[in-house]
């Protein structure tokens, strides 16, 4: 169930679902697994807010276990394409593809709440049963290219050498807010609403 917010206007009362009301304040909620429909919704909101006023920041709150690489990269590409600065605020967790998105916010405007967690790892893939050996080789090559691309993005976003990112992302690597800050994925740990 999505909560509804009632607002008093000069014309009377107006009700919004909570996400529409937050969008009015340039806030986008990226929550849950990253998949195509969710990514398309986030992209549409980014494009709408940028077209509305590209001189104002957009606030992207992130709480996700990760998900589809292609859907996540579509969000990242849109964040980089629009003119508006995108502030990212990690709450709960940014894991897997979520770390790519959260760390791709505008440098100097990447935040994390004190009890949130970050997790990097190598991308996962599979070919399923009954797959021909040639198809398995193609899938393995694609997975390796994807891993190299994601590690380069993480290296660029954190300022860490790609070799370090490669080693650190070999297995699930969970980080506290302080560790995430020290690694370079975020710029500040928020202890109150500093975005106003």
From Swiss-Prot:
InterPro entries: ClpP, ClpP/crotonase-like_dom_sf, ClpP/TepA, ClpP_His_AS, ClpP_Ser_AS
A Pfam entry, by short name: CLP_protease
Active-site residues from the entry: 96, 121
GO CC terms, sorted: cytoplasm; endopeptidase Clp complex
Entry keyword annotation includes Cell cycle: no
GO biological process, one term: protein quality control for misfolded or incompletely synthesized proteins
The entry's keywords: Cytoplasm, Hydrolase, Protease, Serine protease
Catalytic activity as recorded in UniProt: Hydrolysis of proteins to small peptides in the presence of ATP and magnesium. alpha-casein is the usual test substrate. In the absence of ATP, only oligopeptides shorter than five residues are hydrolyzed (such as succinyl-Leu-Tyr-|-NHMec, and Leu-Tyr-Leu-|-Tyr-Trp, in which cleavage of the -Tyr-|-Leu- and -Tyr-|-Trp bonds also occurs)
EC class of the enzyme, as a word: hydrolase
GO molecular function terms attached to this record: ATP-dependent peptidase activity; ATPase binding; serine-type endopeptidase activity
Compartments where found: Cytoplasm
EC code: 3.4.21.92
HAMAP family tied to this protein: ClpP
Summary of subunit composition and partner proteins: Fourteen ClpP subunits assemble into 2 heptameric rings which stack back to back to give a disk-like structure with a central cavity, resembling the structure of eukaryotic proteasomes.
Family the UniProt entry places it in: Belongs to the peptidase S14 family.
Purpose: Cleaves peptides in various proteins in a process that requires ATP hydrolysis. Has a chymotrypsin-like activity. Plays a major role in the degradation of misfolded proteins.
NCBIfam families registered for this protein in UniProt: PRK00277.1, PRK12553.1
Protein's UniProt name: ATP-dependent Clp protease proteolytic subunit
Gene: clpP
